Amino acid sequence: MTPLSTALQSPPAAPEILRRCRELVAPALTEAVGGLHPWVAEMAGYALGHCEMGGAPAVRSQGKGVRQALAVLGAEAAGGPAEAGVPGAVAVELVHTFSLLHDDIMDGDALRRGRPAVWKAYGTGPAVLAGDALFALAVETLTAPATPHAAAAVRHLSAALRDLVRGQADDLLFADRPWRGPESVRVGEYASMAECKTGALLGCALALGAQLAGAPRETVTALDRAGRHLGVAFQIADDLLGIWGDPAVTGKPVHGDLRQGKKTLPVLLALTASGGSALAELLGSPAALDDTAVRRAATLVERAGGRAAALREARRQLAAADGLMASASLAPRPAEELRALLSSLAHRTI
């Protein structure tokens, strides 16, 4: 099988892979959301990028659909038809959207993909309700198909949800811990949080597709672990974009994570470096950081090597994901498509 380093040379295939999977999943996703209460369905459609407030067709592009693509490719890589992965794809997309709805509320993020977050557009209570509905709908989606693998798939999704909540809880608690000292957040704690918060659902997406296609347990486990490594790399990418990302691309203010005092990996790595004391003093100031202060903080993180070290860790996580996929017995063509998708995500990170 082609290693990830080789796949990195040809990332243009990824957009076509994502488009194919989105088009396959879209009818089932639309049908599932359409069964909700009309008001809740509108909020869900808005969150998914299908419509604007009031239900008019969306004028902005929707998300890439990485998780649903992983479920479809997981089914194909296990030797099954793409359609076998569709229930898993719908379920993980609904759970992902539910998590974003609640995450934006907890973090106070007013923007999502360049427009008001659901809680800003519709209100906090309605956004919580829409998230709850999507969570319930995800479980229902997996139980609807009369397949011998549905029960195992629901158990797998439930375990991923448990980890997702654990990761989100850790992320919220990190905010109250000091920047330095014995109570500060350690890099190992960050890795555990990222695997749960982001990696659990990516691993679940790959594993669900394979599971619904009837793959053996070893293959399902290998794909789940690969997705978890991918999730850590994905979270690191978000951390980097949260400090240095272009607002036109991210839809969020530049240096937003620094302004909010988030314990992201580039910052944690910079704090452990020799020049970390100045950064800790700046971030630990009781006064809110103004534009000048957050720009200086970003500079200090980069000078201390936090940005470069985070990039290295992202590459290491991607290599681990690639190694796990190489160890599994996967159908050649879908496996190559998975690698092309990993390549795209690697470029997003690097």
Predicted feature residues:
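Alpha-helical transmembrane segments of multi-pass membrane proteins
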Residues: 99-100, 231-235, 269
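Alpha-helical phosphate/pyrophosphate-handling elements in metalloenzyme active cores
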Residues: 42-91, 137, 141-143, 187-230, ...
